[in-house]
Swiss-Prot record:
Record: residues binding Mn(2+): 101
GO molecular function terms noted in the UniProt entry: dolichyl-phosphate beta-D-mannosyltransferase activity; metal ion binding
GO cellular component: dolichol-phosphate-mannose synthase complex; endoplasmic reticulum membrane
Naturally occurring in which organism (per UniProt): Drosophila melanogaster (Fruit fly)
Localization per record: Endoplasmic reticulum
CDD domains: DPM1_like
InterPro entries, per database record: DPM1-like, Glyco_trans_2-like, Nucleotide-diphossugar_trans
Keywords: Endoplasmic reticulum, Glycosyltransferase, Magnesium, Manganese, Metal-binding, Transferase
Cofactor list: Mg(2+); Mn(2+); Ca(2+)
Protein name: Dolichol-phosphate mannosyltransferase subunit 1
Gene name for this UniProt entry: Dpm1
Function: Transfers mannose from GDP-mannose to dolichol monophosphate to form dolichol phosphate mannose (Dol-P-Man) which is the mannosyl donor in pathways leading to N-glycosylation, glycosyl phosphatidylinositol membrane anchoring, and O-mannosylation of proteins.
Domain of life of the source: Eukaryota
Residues given in the record as Mg(2+) binding sites: 101
Length: 241
């Protein structure tokens, strides 16, 4: 895929990802360079106590300040505000949102971009629940929670997307800004609300099947508090959309 005249800002919120960060950055550089695409990676670290920011600074020295942009914050303030913070510093006209824990393989980013260009879609979302998409590394309980949450979300919200709880997506920058401005949720529910608001705005959404792999290094941030918050916000969205 030759350079297409666009620039892609890859937003990567981090918290305690010092072991994963060098690998995910290396993979992003590999696949974006091979595709001939113009890009930057914006690392938004929320005061990680494990030294993630120091690792990011070392990676910036290796790949250059034009490719690795550091925009840290002092404390853990949530995904939604992390994206808002990152967008303020993004110089691309498209935004890619990706997790830093290696759950999302950067090899899919060029596929997102190719599909977006073919249909001029506003959003391209990675899906674990359509085509040859799937999840690897989760135990039965985690799969059941994810499937159940996604099914319930589909029934209540009808978002016209098969994977409402995923977070690996490509947005037109202005579309992302408008969706975020409409959102009230924080944490993991934020991703779900984004697609619901996109549907309300009439934006077009396409999907690319992805393989989601559970993190190798570090610990998952999903806990009981997040699940309860998810349920509350799901009911709120159902009542207001």
């Amino acid at each position: 895929m030759p350079t297409n005249g666009h620039k892609y800002s890859i937003l990567m919120p981090t918290y305690n990802e010092k072991d994963n960060l060098p690998i995910i950055i290396w993979l992003i550089v590999k696949y974006m360079k091979a595709s001939g695409l113009e890009y930057e990676v914006i690392v938004i670290d929320d005061g990680s106590p494990d030294g993630t920011l120091d690792v990011a600074k070392d990676l910036q020295k290796i790949y250059g300040e034009d490719k690795i942009v550091l925009r840290p914050r002092g404390s853990k303030l949530g995904l939604g505000t992390a994206y808002i913070h990152g967008i303020k510093h993004a110089t691309g006209d498209f935004i890619v949102i990706i997790d830093a824990d290696l759950s999302h393989h950067p090899k899919f980013i060029p596929e997102f971009i190719k599909l977006q260009q073919e249909g001029n879609y506003d959003i391209v979302s990675g899906t674990r629940y359509a085509g040859n998409g799937g999840v690897f590394g989760w135990d039965f309980k985690r799969k059941l929670i994810s499937r159940g949450a996604n099914f319930l979300s589909q029934v209540l919200l009808r978002p016209n997307a098969s994977d409402l709880t995923g977070s690996f997506r490509l947005y037109k920058k202005d579309v992302l800004e408008k969706c975020i401005a409409s959102c009230v949720s924080k944490g993991y529910v934020f991703q779900m609300e984004m697609l619901v608001r996109a549907r309300q705005h009439g934006y077009t959404i396409a999907e690319v099947p992805i393989t989601f792999v559970d993190r190798i290094y570090g610990t998952s941030k999903l806990g009981g508090t997040e699940i309860i918050q998810f349920a509350k916000n799901l009911l709120y969205l159902f009542a207001t959309t």
